[in-house]
């Protein structure tokens, strides 16, 4: 997981013309929802360190399985998706609305 975080921080800019659609786009959004839920929940004391790490790892596995891009482009797309989530209130609403579907639909390969 630390490797993922390092890659996330070091990821360079992806090609701006990359279009992510269909299941890949859904998986990308789901990874962002679960990743942010982990961070928000942990910051508020609602999610343990272990659960935050597990949720973050889930996001990594989903991105690896469902987003067919080079690792640096995948991380750049994830960072863009996180940036597009909007305000905290909007993000909380999206997480509440879609988290269960995301977890059922995108089973990471273990």
What positions do the PLM features span?
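Residue-level marker of positions within ordered structural domains that often coincide
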Residues: 10, 35-36, 107
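Short N-proximal segments of mature Sec-exported proteins
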Residues: 19-69
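Processing junctions and N-termini across compartments
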Residues: 10, 24-25, 96
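Sec-dependent N-terminal signal peptides
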Residues: 2-12
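Compact alpha-helical subdomains of small soluble proteins
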Residues: 50-110
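Sec/Tat signal peptide C-region and signal peptidase I cleavage site
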Residues: 12-18
């Amino acid at each position: 997981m630390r490797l993922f975080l390092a890659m996330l921080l070091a990821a360079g800019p992806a090609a701006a013309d990359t279009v992510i659609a269909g299941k890949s786009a859904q998986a990308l959004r789901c990874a962002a929802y679960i990743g942010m839920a982990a961070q928000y929940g942990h910051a508020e004391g609602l999610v343990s360190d272990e659960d935050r790490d597990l949720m973050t790892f889930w996001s990594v596995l989903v991105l690896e399985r469902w987003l067919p891009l080079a690792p640096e482009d995948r991380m750049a797309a994830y960072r863009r998706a996180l940036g597009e989530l909007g305000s905290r209130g909007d993000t909380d609403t999206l997480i509440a609305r879609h988290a269960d579907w995301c977890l059922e639909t995108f089973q990471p390969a273990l």
